[in-house]
Amino acid sequence: MEILNQRLNQQFDSWMGPRDPRVRGWLLLDNYLPTLSFTIIYLLIVWMGPKYMRNRQPVSCRGILVVYNMALTLLSLYMFYELVTAVWQGGYNFFCQDTHSGGEADNRVINVLWWYYFSKLIEFMDTFFFILRKNNHQITFLHIYHHFTMLNIWWFVMNWVPCGHSYFGATFNSFIHVLMYSYYGLSAIPAIQPYLWWKKYITQGQLVQFVLTMIQTSCAVVWPCGFPKGWLYFQISYMITLIILFSNFYIQTYKKKGTAAKKDPRHNGIKSVNGHSNGASHTNAVKNRKARTD
């Protein structure tokens, strides 16, 4: 195992240059193998989990879902607040910010972005809850792609560019996740569920996030400041893939199916959330349920 870690580290260092010494020794960051292992385990569970649950009753998980989603809401709120205040403290430049001129603000950003990276590991639980509740229609290519790529991308970000221009996407995403996880936490409470109205706007906000992140990243290409351009080009490319996938989800879910869902008497005016309405699965309405995009 140690030999494999050394070979991977040598290969990455030869490709990408020296790592940022400020994160040396941090949990999960010194070696890529733990992150890769978590990813492989995640993909295996995605593949095997639905098979295991095929002939079993769905698990409600309602109480756990409330706690889980509210915990991620609070974590996202903390990360958003810390990033905004740290960026303000360091006088970060919106158009381009290097990784070493922010002083103590850079250290604050690095600390928060480690939590952001770690939160992507926690968010694997989103998929596991879908499997336990037999909401397999929500385990889409978009959902899986978004989850496993974010964890791996942010391992590399944290090792080579853990502050500076890397802050923007994480800040905006943390804000969106405050809205998203609060929605899904509240939607697990039957008495509150009928009053939730902002799910559609979460997807719109995610699309705005990707577009603005791509624009902000492009600014650093046009007006360089020393932030590695290879990272900028990769970020732009990744944002394009997310814009395409999320746009397709939005069109399929809200444009083409919106009219049909309104006419479906089985919903009785209450939208299905995560495959449940009033806390009970209604498997007869699979075709009309909306998938999460996170």
From Swiss-Prot:
Domain of life according to the entry: Eukaryota
Residue ranges with Polar residues bias: 274-286
Membrane-crossing segments per the record: 26-46, 64-84, 112-132, 141-161, 172-192, 207-227, 231-251
Tissues where this protein is expressed: Expression is highest in intestine, followed by brain and heart, and lowest in gill. Also expressed in liver, spleen and muscle.
An individual GO BP term: sphingolipid biosynthetic process
One GO location term (cellular component): dendrite
Enzyme Commission code: 2.3.1.199
Keyword Zinc found: no
Reactions catalysed, as given in the entry: a very-long-chain acyl-CoA + malonyl-CoA + H(+) = a very-long-chain 3-oxoacyl-CoA + CO2 + CoA; (6Z,9Z,12Z)-octadecatrienoyl-CoA + malonyl-CoA + H(+) = (8Z,11Z,14Z)-3-oxoeicosatrienoyl-CoA + CO2 + CoA; (9Z,12Z,15Z)-octadecatrienoyl-CoA + malonyl-CoA + H(+) = (11Z,14Z,17Z)-3-oxoeicosatrienoyl-CoA + CO2 + CoA; (9Z)-hexadecenoyl-CoA + malonyl-CoA + H(+) = 3-oxo-(11Z)-octadecenoyl-CoA + CO2 + CoA
Annotated region (Disordered), positions in chain: 261-294
Subcellular location: Endoplasmic reticulum membrane; Cell projection, Dendrite
Top-tier EC class: transferase
Membrane topology, from the record: Multi-pass membrane protein
Swiss-Prot/TrEMBL keywords: Cell projection, Endoplasmic reticulum, Fatty acid biosynthesis, Fatty acid metabolism, Lipid biosynthesis, Lipid metabolism, Membrane, Transferase, Transmembrane, Transmembrane helix
Pathway: Lipid metabolism; polyunsaturated fatty acid biosynthesis
GO molecular function per UniProt: fatty acid elongase activity
Keyword Transmembrane attributed: yes
InterPro entries given in the database record: ELO_fam (IPR002076), ELOVL5 (IPR033677)
Signal peptide: none
Task performed by this protein: Catalyzes the first and rate-limiting reaction of the four reactions that constitute the long-chain fatty acids elongation cycle. This endoplasmic reticulum-bound enzymatic process allows the addition of 2 carbons to the chain of long- and very long-chain fatty acids (VLCFAs) per cycle. Condensing enzyme that acts specifically toward polyunsaturated acyl-CoA with the higher activity toward C18:3(n-6) acyl-CoA.
Family to which this protein belongs: Belongs to the ELO family. ELOVL5 subfamily.
Protein name listed in UniProt: Very long chain fatty acid elongase 5
Organism: Tachysurus fulvidraco
The gene coding this protein: ELOVL5
